[in-house]
Amino acid sequence: MEGLLVMADISGYTKFVAGTEAEHSREILAELMDGIAKSFGGRLAIDQVEGDALACTTERTDVGVVDWLRETFRLFHGRLRDIRTATTCPCRACATVQDLGLKFIVHRGEFSRYEVAGRVQLHGNDVNVVHRLLKNTVPLREYLLATAAAQTSWPESLRGQLKAAPQTYDVGAVDAAYLDLRPVRDSVWNEPRPKVDPASAKIRGTVRYPGTPEQVFRYFTDASLRKLWMGVPCVDFVPGARGSLVGAEYHCIHGENQKTVFKVLDSSAPNEITMQMDFPLAGTVWRTDRIEAEGPATTRVDTAIAWQAHGIKAPLVDFMVRRMLLKYGAVYNKRVAEMLAVPDQETARASV
């Protein structure tokens, strides 16, 4: 079989494991490796897991593979950032997670597969080449190193960005060049945490609920309770960084092939939470809820919602989206208030 052989390798793995607490470093690395694997899902076949690296293959050889790897790189650093934001643990593993990095090795060649004790192994001279390339002379920690063979189907616009980095091994000389991924990393880490400013929000509102901020926050974030007040058949919860809410997703299933995904961008329990979702006409919608006690048995929630509409139809889009969001919001707010008024009964229903 011929195609691209791809190695995704976490940089700084050995130092991270050696210098940090074993339990937390193991959990963090498992989360990162799982994130890389999920990003590759359905696009690159993961043939081998090699500690801090994944050996992958694909019959695709075009520039689309590079686009996939850039996307995976962004998701990797987005997860690192979420872990750093979410954790309050002072251990070295949690405090130095931003020192980890990711690099890719890409080579085009022939390979075959065989099994040992039920585990797939890759075989072939080109498999040896891509593994040798993990040890190279590239003067960076994060990059995409591609052989000349891998680049043959890529456009000149991309090849022109690569810097030559020929390598020599026992398997012979390998013509290769690398792409610096540091600008992508910097863009992720420097991207401001989106919170909706009430002054620029397209929808602003205040609702008062019976109960404490902790109770209200729980009703907003507990998937089983969200299922009840949204009135949908199912809400699947995907945990965020280190099991937190930051980066978490709520997959709200409305019916066959109908799903709305709410992603938590920022959270400071029980006082504030920012989510984003895809909404008809508007595209991405952002919502920030600011939660504050108002007396011993009442909680005030100030909500700010924003989206971006462009073009000549923007006023009409704004009108339609605002109308729909206010309609849904009124229904949901009423249900949450009713549920909070009889919390024991609703908690029992949610646990069924």
Where are these regions (language model features)?
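Residue-level recognition of strand-loop junctions within catalytic nucleotide-signaling folds
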Residues: 58-60, 255, 306
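Intrinsically disordered, glycine/charged-rich C-terminal tails and inter-domain linkers
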Residues: 139-215
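Catalytic NTP-binding/metal-coordinating core of nucleotidyl cyclase/transferase enzymes
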Residues: 1-71
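Beta-strand elements of well-folded, non-transmembrane domains
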Residues: 12, 37, 110, 211, ...
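A conserved amphipathic terminal alpha-helix motif
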Residues: 306-352
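Hydrophobic ligand-binding cavity/cleft-lining segments
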Residues: 192-241, 352
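Glycine-rich portal/gate segments that line the openings of hydrophobic small-molecule binding cavities
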Residues: 208, 227-228, 237-286, 300, ...
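Catalytic beta-strand-to-alpha-helix segment of the class III nucleotidyl cyclase homology domain
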Residues: 61-168
